[in-house]
Amino acid sequence: MQIKLANPRGFCAGVDRAIEIVNRALDVFGPPIYVRHEVVHNKFVVDNLRQRGAIFVEELDQVPNNVIVIFSAHGVSQAVRKEAEGRGLKVFDATCPLVTKVHMEVVRYSRDGHECVLIGHEGHPEVEGTMGQYDASNGGAIYLVEDEADVAALEVRKPEALHYVTQTTLSMDDTSKVIDALRAKFPQIQGPRKNDICYATQNRQDAVKELADQCDMVLVVGSPNSSNSNRLRELAERMGTPAYLIDGAEDMQRGWFDGVRRIGITAGASAPEVLVRGVIAQLREWGASEEQELEGREENITFSMPKELRVKAL
């Protein structure tokens, strides 16, 4: 068996920053540090931070007074921010800057009294946070659609003042179909100047397509609740290549690889490289040859830390 590795794969700049915010808060202020929602959707990462003293909660009413709370990379609604301010909680915001960009677009549409359509998955924390940026007091509304059927059923009040934004971790192919449906139904709809699907999502989807084209099977390292990891698995399967989403080597079954000559491995944007290395080590034990990394696309984007958590130069 030959192993091929997607490039890029694994952590993106937003995930790196979010995890580092929790780690530095623990270093500077000591445990416990409260985190609203899993800071990123990866079991290994969350378990490690929990062992260091991070306490993960779903709502701020689970957070005591006079503590530090961190908002996850997925972002939060304006209501959550106001609740934290009202209670005087010290907040560090780990929202990915590319999610914040979408939030600012929604706030602008809301302020101007324009309506907005969000393309995304209902119930995902990023979607809840983005929907929660819209203030309907100016007479507009925000609508959520997931697919072309939702667009067909959608009725808006202001088709002449309508915009769309997207969740940052969607499938580019699926999203383009929804956008086409929106434009066909609402010819005056306007989109953002720049695609809302983030660079890391796009790069990893391009890489898994290349991987699936060269392999008999694809393994996607990522947790089941990771949106971008699920999209990678779906993309590989759509290209006709069997694919499995795994948290790590412990999820693999030896029988999966009977008759497989080329195994492709990628990782979602919230999955650390150590898990990929564990998968490779297990495959090598089962007889796989040394891995080959595909050329891919270099990523050198970084996002700054909150001022109080920046490491001072010696």
Swiss-Prot record:
Dimethylallyl diphosphate binds at H41, H74, H124, S226, S227, N228, S270. Its cofactor is [4Fe-4S] cluster. Pathway: Isoprenoid biosynthesis; dimethylallyl diphosphate biosynthesis; dimethylallyl diphosphate from (2E)-4-hydroxy-3-methylbutenyl diphosphate: step 1/1; Isoprenoid biosynthesis; isopentenyl diphosphate biosynthesis via DXP pathway; isopentenyl diphosphate from 1-deoxy-D-xylulose 5-phosphate: step 6/6. Keywords: 4Fe-4S, Iron, Iron-sulfur, Isoprene biosynthesis, Metal-binding, Oxidoreductase. Signal peptide: none annotated. [4Fe-4S] cluster binds at C12, C96, C198. One of its GO terms (cellular component) is cytosol. Pfam families: LYTB. GO terms for molecular function: 4 iron, 4 sulfur cluster binding; 4-hydroxy-3-methylbut-2-enyl diphosphate reductase activity; metal ion binding. NCBIfam families: ispH_lytB (TIGR00216), PRK01045.1-2 (NF002188), PRK01045.1-4 (NF002190). This is 4-hydroxy-3-methylbut-2-enyl diphosphate reductase. It comes from Pseudomonas aeruginosa (strain ATCC 15692 / DSM 22644 / CIP 104116 / JCM 14847 / LMG 12228 / 1C / PRS 101 / PAO1). The lineage of its organism: Bacteria, Pseudomonadati, Pseudomonadota, Gammaproteobacteria, Pseudomonadales. The gene is ispH.
